[in-house]
Structure formats: structure tokens, C-alpha cells
Amino acid sequence: MDARGGGGRPGDSPGATPAPGPPPPPPPPAPPQPQPPPAPPPNPTTPSHPESADEPGPRSRLCSRDSSCTPGAAKGGANGECGRGEPQCSPEGPARGPKVSFSCRGAASGPAAAEEAGSEEAGPAGEPRGSQASFLQRQFGALLQPGVNKFSLRMFGSQKAVEREQERVKSAGAWIIHPYSDFRFYWDFTMLLFMVGNLIIIPVGITFFKDETTAPWIVFNVVSDTFFLMDLVLNFRTGIVIEDNTEIILDPEKIKKKYLRTWFVVDFVSSIPVDYIFLIVEKGIDSEVYKTARALRIVRFTKILSLLRLLRLSRLIRYIHQWEEIFHMTYDLASAVMRICNLISMMLLLCHWDGCLQFLVPMLQDFPSDCWVSINNMVNHSWSELYSFALFKAMSHMLCIGYGRQAPESMTDIWLTMLSMIVGATCYAMFIGHATALIQSLDSSRRQYQEKYKQVEQYMSFHKLPADFRQKIHDYYEHRYQGKMFDEDSILGELNGPLREEIVNFNCRKLVASMPLFANADPNFVTAMLTKLKFEVFQPGDYIIREGTIGKKMYFIQHGVVSVLTKGNKEMKLSDGSYFGEICLLTRGRRTASVRADTYCRLYSLSVDNFNEVLEEYPMMRRAFETVAIDRLDRIGKKNSILLHKVQHDLSSGVFNNQENAIIQEIVKYDREMVQQAELGQRVGLFPPPPPPQVTSAIATLQQAVAMSFCPQVARPLVGPLALGSPRLVRRAPPGPLPPAASPGPPAASPPAAPSSPRAPRTSPYGVPGSPATRVGPALPARRLSRASRPLSASQPSLPHGAPAPSPAASARPASSSTPRLGPAPTTRTAAPSPDRRDSASPGAASGLDPLDSARSRLSSNL
């Protein structure tokens, strides 16, 4: 047979000679099957093994293993050749598809072939012998291996690691049980039930029941002892977890040696069927000896006290703790519940044992006259009444609250009482210690805050600070940490980048939602900004920014109200979602206004270095900031050569395309028009005396740059100079026609412009229609303000959401210029509104008219 036939290999029989003569004739075809092709001539290098044609070889055995192949198709030539025939299918058995039959002849040689032939013998029905047994073995073997579930993935890290652990179990040997397998889980749970039953029932049975030969008692002992003996055997085949390095031992020899050195003796002694020995020996014991032999029942009770049972209970508690983690329970809650349950269970179990011991000792002494049972005449009472009195006596001793109904009189009772007190005091101290540690661990952040504040109090006492200073420090800590202290930088620093960004975005979600700059910007830009923010808290009266100092930070208001103050005693309120101090991040100049906290303020600060670092990755945002800042400085008569040189260099080098330059110019134009509109709104007598027009902030208009940089398609122009498709930037058209006075073009006459002061501030308070700063007048009551109309910045309040953006053609204002006019407004425009105008304004506000339209109406009536 050649090597392809599988019946033999060259070199199997070195002494054989090639078969001479012509090739043998092909075998006769079988009647029910098609004729197989003729066999090829024998290979001269292959030795011939003439055997019986009816003896199947390895290939024929392989063929006969499938019930769909006929045995007749597996026969080959006379010299052991193999030929491939047509697919042969048998109508009997389940449909498995056509099988390709091999015509083989010749016996296999060698031990490997014999082993293969022996393992592939077919049964009478064509199925391999032992296939059903192999299936059951595979299923049971899977129970002995760790499954792919949440617990195993958490323990081993990945599915591939679990598969490697499964291969370890397979290679360790037959019937090796993994400690994290499903079989061990169910077995430990079953042993828990038997263990609890033994810990509770056996002491009661030994102490309060005299007849131990009843059927229920025998059945309970037989079943429990059988399971304990089975557990003893399974412990030799169960892997051992090394707690130090989390290694799992699966080698049978190592498991046996370690188990024999540790808990085998205790487990073996506790699993001996002592009750069976009592039943056998009791038949040959007379009544006089039986009384002394009854003391042997203590052996059964000592088995309950085996440390192995308590160790299994603690192991089950660890399993429960792991299950609670799998079911997404919090760590503190799970550990607290399990520790409390363990302590309560141990206390109750010890009280139960002590109560049984209080009655067991007098019973072994045949109830002497000075024992508590004889004194109370309770010898013949029911076992439930005796157990209740004994348990009450034991708990009184263990809790150190008394001696029970009467003090001990006999020496035995005295020693039992002292033993109960010692055990009870120890358990009570352990319970108090664990409970105290448990309470502290449940609120470690509050405990850390209290420890920190104690140091602060000692510091204040050492420096003898006044009482008002101490109260301010106390209030600061209360509002800054709110009774809990965390090392937030350390916690966030230990997380990976994506998770840290998600947490920062979640913590600042209210800030992002309340700021148009963040709400319309690129998410990557917003994330980069948020990760640089630092949380700060200021008390009422604290000056967050002082005028004349160098600007190193800008602030975003999360909660609170601040006042922006200038040397001209002008004041403007900023609240949640506003920000201030932004221009100094670009110019690195000095502050032009002071900012004071009116309430407790929770702010996020951004340093100039971090801000510039973020802008390095977004040049479009930097260019927009710089261009608007230059235009604002030019309008107040100031220049910054560094910013001017950078912008001119960008224009000359062509860094930005025409579309981006057009967007930036539109932002500058929109910024100018917002300043002029704010100036116009302040000259309607809403905020007497009329403040000078101020310069807007770059950040208030950068939301449009962000939106257009990522969405160049500009929405249809509505009313304002620039309207984007963003829902936060669209200015809706007014519901009614504009007043007649608001005609296109500048007014016929404009007031003379006052000379601008060289010390005009770069960040000064002013208001626009709809901002809190301009709604304090009698014409627009403050109670009709909406939160959406709050100012966005210390230097640029925002228009109210939903209000129409005024355009140069639709606004009655003087002609625009690069530098706004400064100085007082004409007296005709600052006159106090008449009662008629006030009455006319109220219905408009009540009917839903926009505040900006109301201001325009009053302005037209003045004109």
C-alpha cells in the first residue's frame, strides 16, 4: 500500500521485499454499489502484506464509524491499495449528507495505527462506541472549568485568559475541579446548607433530646456525614487559590500535599460518623454504663466547633461579596452588609452554643440540687422551655448585664458564668470595633474633611485669628468642600484619558449647557478647554479681579452672582453661565475693571498658559480672538502692537483662506453692531445717568466663528447682520412690523461725539435690551426678565434668546464709525419716561412682545 492509502508506511517492515509480477486485478464490484475504479499498481518500494480481504484496516474502520457508509464500500484491493469510490449513503439512520467512501485493503501496522483502530471501532448501529459517554464527559468536564461570565472575566481579565485557564484544567488531569467553576459553586452552596444545619441542629439534639435512635435523627446524620465525607474527597481534586499572589494550584500532587498539611486532619475528624459508632456500641452497653457513655456526645459537639466549618463560612462570604460586585452593587454597601451579617451571625451562633452549654453541663451531672435547672424545678419541662431559659441565661452573661433569673450557686455554674462573660466580652468588643471601623469606612471622605478642619482650627488658634476671620474660613470650607474632601487631582490623574474626559464633561455639563461659546463650539475644543479648568470658590465680598493688576486668568461662573466695577462707579451683574477676564488672556495686559462676588460663587478658572495652549491647536479660534480684540482696542483708542503684527502677518502670508477671512470680518462687524446697539439701548433712559458706550468682548461673538468654521453654510439672513443655522444663534424676526421711526439709514441728526478718554476701560459694564444691567429702570420691570437674557460676559452681555438681532438698516442709531462716540447723551433721549409710556410698555410685555421691540417703540416715541 502506498503512503496515501494509510494502510502502511515505508519502513514499517524493513525485511519485506516488493511484490513481483503484474499488478493484481481490480476487486469485483459489489451488487448494490457502483464499481470502484481499478487500483493503481503497487509501489515497488512499499512492502506487501497479504492479508485476508475481509479484515478491515484503519481506513475501513474510519469508514465504518459513520452509519451512512456501507461496509462493503470500504474494501480495497488484495495488496492493501486504497481507492476512492463514489459517495455511499445508507437510508438508515439520520440524514448526514453523502459520505465519500474509501476502498482500502490491508491491515495497519504499528502501535499508533492499532490505537487508532481500537478507538474507532463502530457499534452495531454504526455509531462509535462510547460516543454518548464522551458527550456526557465533555458536558461534565465543562462544569469543572471556569465559564466565560462576568465573574471570570473580572478575575482573569479577558476571555482569552479564561480560555487559557480552561486549557490548564484540561491539561492538569482527569477530574480536577477549578475553584471558580460552576460545579464548585453549587457544591459550596450545598455544603453551606448542611453546615448551617449541623451548627444549629446538632447542639440542640445532643443537649435537649435523649433518644438519638429515631428515624429523622438517623437520616439527618447519615445524609450530612455522607456529604461531609464526599467534600473531604473532593478537596483532594479541587484547585487551591493562593491569596498572596492570586495563583491557582491545579497540580494534583501539590493539591494533595498542601491539603494534608493544612485542614485535612480537622476535616477528617469532623467527618467521622460518630453516631453510627454510638448505635453499634449502644446495644452491648447496660444502663449503668450508658450514663457515662453519654458524655461521648461531646465529641459530636466538638465537631461543630471545627475551624474548618467557620473557614467555609468565611469563604462563602467572599463568594457572596464577589457575586454582589458582579451584580453591580457598590463596594461600600456590599462590604458593609456582609460584615454586619457576619458579626450578627457569629454573635447569635455563639449565644446558641452557650445556651446549649448552660444546660448540657447540669445534664451530664444528672441535675444536681444546686444547679439552675433543679432550683427552678424545670427538669421535666419541655425542651423549648428549657432552651429559652438557657439562652436567656447565656445572653445575660455574654452581654454582661446580669446573671439571669438568679446568681450562680454551684462551682460549676460559677465557672460557666465566667466563661460566658469572657467569651461575651470578647465578642462584644470585636463587634464594637468592627462596627466603628465599618461606619468610618462608609464615609471616609467626611472623616477626611473633619480631620482636615481640625488642623485648620488648630492653625487659627495658634495664630490667634479674630472671630470674624475664623467664621469666614469656616464658611469657605463649608461651601468649598461641602463636608466632604476628595483628592480630585489624584483621582483624575489615575484614570485614563477617555474616562477622565468623560468625567470632566459630566461635571461641567451645566456650565457647557449654559454658555453659547461652548454649546456651539467644536466638541474637541470644548473638551480641551474643560480639562484645563480649575474649580474655585469665592465668598461674598471677595474681589476676584482687581483693576490694574495683570490678567492671568479668566473665569466661568457655574453658580453665583458677581458685580463688575470700574473707576467710574459703574456696576453690572453677571450670573450663571457668564464669564469675564477674557481679553487679558490674549493681550497679557492689566485689568480694566474689578470683579466682586456678591454671593457664594462657584467658578472655573482658566490660566493664560492653558488657554494659549488650547488655541495653538485651533488657529481659527486664535485668529478670531485676536482680530476682535484688535478691533475693540482700536475703538477705544488703544493699540496692541503684538496682536496687530500677528494679524497683519497672517493676512500677508495667506494662512487663512478667503472664506475664513470673510467669517472673521463678519465677526468683527457683528461685534461692532452689538456695541452700537448696546449704546443705543442705554440711551433710552433705562440706566440713568447714561453710561458711555463700551467695547464688546471677543468671546461673545466667537460662537458664530465656531459654528461657521465647522458649518460654512450660513442660514438665511433674518433680521440681524449675521444669522446662523445654530438654534442658539438664530434671531427670530419680530412678530409685528417695526415702528415707523426705525427706518433704514442713519437718523437725520446725531448728537456730537465727546472726546474719547485715553483711559477708557477695555472691560466696562454696559447693557443691552434684555440684559440684567439695563432692566432695572421703570420702563422694563425686572420681574419680567427671563434667565436666557442674562449677559454672557463682563464686557459683552448677550442678546436675549429669541430676540431679533438688530441690523444697521432696522435700527435707529447714528452712523457707525471705528471709534464710538463717548460722552453724555442728549437730554431729549435721557428724559424720564412718562406715565403714558410706562402704561404702554406694560401691555406689550404682557402680550408677549420682545423687550427689544418695546425699547425701540419708546425710542421712536422720544424721537
Swiss-Prot record:
Topology Extracellular: residue spans: 210-213, 283-290, 364-386, 409-413
This protein's GO CC annotations: axon; dendrite; dendrite membrane; dendritic shaft; HCN channel complex; membrane; neuronal cell body; plasma membrane
Topology versus the membrane: Multi-pass membrane protein
Modifications the protein undergoes after translation, according to the UniProt entry: Phosphorylation at Ser-641 by PRKG2 shifts the voltage-dependence to more negative voltages, hence counteracting the stimulatory effect of cGMP on gating. N-glycosylated; required for cell surface trafficking of HCN2.
Region (Disordered): 1-131, 730-863
Biased composition (Low complexity): 106-128, 756-765, 778-834
Ranges for region Involved in subunit assembly: 131-182
Keyword vocabulary terms for this entry: Ammonia transport, cAMP, cAMP-binding, Cell membrane, Glycoprotein, Ion channel, Ion transport, Ligand-gated ion channel, Lipoprotein, Membrane, Methylation, Nucleotide-binding, Palmitate, Phosphoprotein, Potassium, Potassium channel, Potassium transport, Sodium, Sodium channel, Sodium transport, Transmembrane, Transmembrane helix, Transport, Voltage-gated channel
Sugar-modified residues: N380
Omega-N-methylarginine carried by residues: R728
GO molecular function: cAMP binding; identical protein binding; intracellularly cAMP-activated cation channel activity; molecular adaptor activity; PDZ domain binding; protein-containing complex binding; voltage-gated potassium channel activity; voltage-gated sodium channel activity
Record field: transmembrane: 189-209, 214-234, 262-282, 291-311, 343-363, 414-434
Parts of the chain in the membrane but not crossing it: 387-408
Ranges annotated as biased composition (Pro residues): 17-47, 734-755
Catalytic activity: Na(+)(in) = Na(+)(out); K(+)(in) = K(+)(out); NH4(+)(in) = NH4(+)(out)
UniProt-annotated location(s): Cell membrane
Residue(s) carrying Phosphoserine: S119, S134, S641, S726, S743, S750, S757, S840, S842, S847
Database matches in Pfam families: cNMP_binding, Ion_trans, Ion_trans_N
GO annotation terms (biological process): ammonium transmembrane transport; cellular response to aldosterone; cellular response to cAMP; cellular response to cGMP; potassium ion import across plasma membrane; potassium ion transmembrane transport; regulation of membrane depolarization; regulation of membrane potential
Assembly behavior: Homotetramer. The channel is composed of a homo- or heterotetrameric complex of pore-forming subunits. Heterotetramer with HCN1. Forms an obligate 4:4 complex with accessory subunit PEX5L. Interacts with KCNE2.
Family listed: Belongs to the potassium channel HCN family.
Domain free text: The segment S4 is the voltage-sensor and is characterized by a series of positively charged amino acids at every third position. Thee ion-conducting pore region is between segment S5 and S6.
Function: Hyperpolarization-activated ion channel exhibiting weak selectivity for potassium over sodium ions. Contributes to the native pacemaker currents in heart (If) and in neurons (Ih). Can also transport ammonium in the distal nephron. Involved in the initiation of neuropathic pain in sensory neurons. Produces a large instantaneous current.
Protein name: Potassium/sodium hyperpolarization-activated cyclic nucleotide-gated channel 2
Native source organism of the sequence: Rattus norvegicus
